[in-house]
Amino acid sequence: MKSVILASIAAMFATSAMAADVVVSEPSAPTAAPVDTFSWTGGYIGINAGYAGGKFKHPFSSFDKEDNEQVSGSLDVTAGGFVGGVQAGYNWQLDNGVVLGAETDFQGSSVTGSISAGASGLEGKAETKVEWFGTVRARLGYTATERLMVYGTGGLAYGKVKSAFNLGDDASALHTWSDKTKAGWTLGAGAEYAINNNWTLKSEYLYTDLGKRNLVDVDNSFLESKVNFHTVRVGLNYKF
């Protein structure tokens, strides 16, 4: 009987010791989901399309030998057409949300303006067309939200401008054509939105001035060309 009691006590102590060795694991804390951060820093390439228009001015003066008087005025040609092209650039985003960037683009253009019959006292026709143009610009932006940037932009503009004039009669005539690359400046603003970490959409406005040049400057006659226009376009960029 005594041996049975001793065996029972020994078994009870053994069970207690085993229970003390059992480790109960605590449930692990939930892991926080990674924060989806976006940075504008990096290079990109893209495409764009839009519409451009403006008023091309052509101041002129021609001496009318029959009436013995100087005929002067300006042919203000309303121009417009579609534009489309490609762009590439690089952005640097600062800690305060400011984004510094540089961008270049090249555009095909159908922007054309013409006028005919009895313009400013001269009979005939005048036509000017921007065949293509491009820009090299700086961009200064600010992140209104993590994925939305608004910016201003400006820099160098250049383009090929073709002009043809056949104005006046034999006594006071301006007949000429020109097909030259012109340089000027551009200034504008836009907004760009990151769809995801690689693709962005933008809308942009640019004012472009391709400068002034003499088309005719002989004797008592001259004809100048002043080409400037407004561009509104949308674009799609792929960010590296």
Swiss-Prot record:
Main location, first listed in the record: membrane
Spans annotated as Epitope recognized by the monoclonal antibody A59/10F09/G10: 48-83
Xref: InterPro entries: OMP-like, OMP/PagP_b-brl, OMP_b-brl
Function, as annotated: Major outer membrane protein associated with peptidoglycans. May function as a porin.
Protein's organism: Brucella melitensis biotype 1 (strain ATCC 23456 / CCUG 17765 / NCTC 10094 / 16M)
Coiled-coil positions: none
Family of this protein: Belongs to the Omp25/RopB family.
Keywords: Cell outer membrane, Ion transport, Membrane, Porin, Signal, Transmembrane, Transmembrane beta strand, Transport
Subcellular location: Cell outer membrane
Protein name as annotated: 31 kDa outer-membrane immunogenic protein
